[in-house]
UniProtKB/Swiss-Prot annotation:
Localization per record: Mitochondrion inner membrane
Gene: nuo-12.3
Domain of life: Eukaryota
Stretches that traverse the bilayer: none
Protein name: NADH-ubiquinone oxidoreductase 12 kDa subunit, mitochondrial
Summary of subunit composition and partner proteins: Complex I is composed of about 40 different subunits.
Keyword presence, NAD: no
Keyword Electron transport appears in the UniProt entry: yes
Biological source species: Neurospora crassa (strain ATCC 24698 / 74-OR23-1A / CBS 708.71 / DSM 1257 / FGSC 987)
Entry keyword set: Electron transport, Membrane, Mitochondrion, Mitochondrion inner membrane, Respiratory chain, Transit peptide, Transport
Purpose: Accessory subunit of the mitochondrial membrane respiratory chain NADH dehydrogenase (Complex I), that is believed not to be involved in catalysis. Complex I functions in the transfer of electrons from NADH to the respiratory chain. The immediate electron acceptor for the enzyme is believed to be ubiquinone.
Length: 104
């Protein structure tokens, strides 16, 4: 069962998507919200990788000599998350932003 979200948490939860689409760069409040949302999403992915790493270490300890065959799925998932999910920041995306254009 998911943990209920408090009013204080909901007040700080971002209301903008983690992208610069539709953000007016002169509106500093909306720009900062978009930056925070992007950083937050990157950290969520990093923390997901950390959780998989913790489960992998528990599996290695639990399985002992059979860890190579018993923990393979966690190892593959962790290596995939490790290569994809890094905190990169928002500056490159902000400075090189191209609006989504329809494909022709």
């Amino acid at each position: 069962m998911p943990t209920p979200e408090s009013a204080a948490f909901l007040a700080k939860k971002p209301t903008v998507p983690p992208t610069f689409d539709g953000v007016d760069y002169n509106d500093t409040k909306r720009l900062k919200q978009a930056q925070d949302a992007i950083i937050r999403e990157q950290w969520v992915r990093v923390m997901m990788g950390r959780l998989v790493r913790e489960e992998l270490s528990k599996c290695y300890y639990r399985e002992g000599v059979n860890h190579l065959e018993k923990c393979g799925h966690l190892r593959e998932r962790y290596l995939q998350l490790l290569s994809e999910n890094r905190v990169q920041g928002y500056l490159f995306e902000q400075q090189n932003h191209f609006a989504n254009q329809p494909k022709q």
